[in-house]
Amino acid sequence: MRPEDLARMSVAELRERFLDRNRALSPECEAALTTDPRAGAREVLRLILKRRHANRAEGQRLRHLLRYEGELWDGGVTLVAGVDEAGMAPLAGPVVAGACILPRDYRPRGIDDSKQLDRRERERLAEDIKANAVCWAVARAEVEEIDRLNIYRAGLLALTRAVQALTPAPGHVLVDARKLPELRLPQTPIIHGDALSLTIAAASILAKTTRDELMGELDALYPGYGFCNHKGYPTAEHFQALERLGACPIHRRSFQPVREALGLAPLQGELFAPPPESAAEPGGEGAIAGIAPGSAPCDVAEPLPARTPASARGI
């Protein structure tokens, strides 16, 4: 398109071509819009430049989120996994971990730590991640395991199970904040990893959306507690329900507010003490995987309800 053609287009036509259809604007046409006497035409240019700036900023942000992955890729590690968990603080329900391996060219717009996203964005991104990941998995540690091991070690168990459910297996694992002692794979713990690594952020979204969906299902089994609203977290609504109804089977008996509701004495336990020899079974229950076509699924007991498997993409 020539600059003189712009003068013959209405403002509505300019909007439709350059904003709605996102057609490229040449430097000559950009200069012509700068001096266009119509305020509406200049506004179209302002919006074009604003979107261009936002796209560049998003591209830079995503490149920044891939610096850990990039170092590993450049070092010859092809399959880099990220893993994160959701549900450490709630008074009820399991802790759920998500893990995934992403293609090198995958740049999901808007991805961030799951806590920074609203429900609709998390769900949109979760479906996109599952559709584009090399492989993905979610796993959980049940309430009984949380009460037996404590929440910290149960979180490690869920994280380990999620990574071990990935097929193909990763060559390196990026973990949010912690190291997984039962995982015999190279790994890098990253403080605030869900805000600093794209792959961990993707895993956090898988964990959060899976757990939220599960708590909605548990709300139907245990009505009156409001699990579909607070997801088991310690809110005023949850405390009122505990006082009114008492604890239900998915409440964590090792957590003090639940023990108070049951009239039990406080527990005195060392949070970071090594788990019993028989307690850690990382490859055990509670894992499902999204698997690249052609790979054998992981054999795990008591899986979560089946989810849509991931599609393979080149790395």
Curated annotation (Swiss-Prot):
Gene Ontology CC: one annotated term: ribonuclease H2 complex
Cofactors: Mn(2+); Mg(2+)
EC number: 3.1.26.4
Residues engaged in binding a divalent metal cation: 84-85, 176
Catalytic activity: Endonucleolytic cleavage to 5'-phosphomonoester
Class of this enzyme: hydrolase
RNase H type-2 domain sequence ranges: 78-267
Cofactor binding comment, as recorded: Manganese or magnesium. Binds 1 divalent metal ion per monomer in the absence of substrate. May bind a second metal ion after substrate binding.
Localization terms from the record: Cytoplasm
InterPro entries linked: RNase_HII (IPR022898), RNase_HII/HIII (IPR001352), RNase_HII/HIII_dom (IPR024567), RNaseH-like_sf (IPR012337), RNaseH_sf (IPR036397)
Biased composition (Low complexity): 278-292
Record keywords: Cytoplasm, Endonuclease, Hydrolase, Manganese, Metal-binding, Nuclease
Region entry Disordered, spans: 273-292
Any one Gene Ontology BP term: mismatch repair
Sample GO molecular function, one term: RNA binding
Family according to the record: Belongs to the RNase HII family.
Function: Endonuclease that specifically degrades the RNA of RNA-DNA hybrids.
Protein name, entry field: Ribonuclease HII
